Amino acid sequence: GVASSDATNMQATAVLDGDEYVINGEKWWTSGAGDPRCKILVFMAVTNPEAAKHQRHSMMLVPMESEGIEIQKMMHVFGYDDAPHGHAHIKFNNVRIPKDNLLLGEGRGFEIAQGRLGPGRIHHCMRTIGVGERAIELMCKRGIDPSKTPFGKNIASLGANFDYIA
């Protein structure tokens, strides 16, 4: 496999054979694949290895029940499995899909991925900032809670707690 987050460095292939693409390769961190409601995968593969670096890949829809799809294992992130949604390591062995399952056209996979990843990254950053702000809010609230007064003082005034909040 390829140990990289460089989307242009993938090895999974989709080769046109008549009216079908034949998919071979592996995908790690396939989000949502563990969820029993997941019926279709959005799959990016090399369709033209001779094309320019950012035009080699195509995006296609792959039904989960397709013959040749094998979930190898579910992945953990910092010990958390995100069940049942999860992230999977999947092998694709001669998986055949109709050529009509191609999205936007051959060579446009990288373009599609970048169009989705940019806004997705902003979304995750905003969510994380929001969670951080909420944690600080709860910490401050607890620090001055009149019902929490060990040694007769509020928690914020004890030890380094005020510094931690700052």
How would you label these PLM feature ranges?
Residues 5-8, 33-38, 52-56, 82-84, ...:
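Short glycine/proline-enriched turns and hinge-like loops at secondary-structure junctions
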Residues 70-166:
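Glycine-rich beta->alpha junctions and the first turn(s) of the following alpha-helix
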Residues 24-72:
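A short core secondary-structure module
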Residues 1-5, 28-35, 119-123:
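Glycine-rich phosphate/pyrophosphate-binding beta-alpha loops
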Residues 10-12, 39-41, 57-58, 67, ...:
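Structural beta-strand/beta-sheet cores of well-ordered domains, especially the beta-sheet scaffolds
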Residues 1-16:
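A gly/ser-rich beta-alpha-beta helix-loop segment of oxidoreductase catalytic cores
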Residues 14, 23-25, 60, 92, ...:
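Buried hydrophobic positions in well-ordered alpha/beta secondary-structure cores of metabolic enzymes
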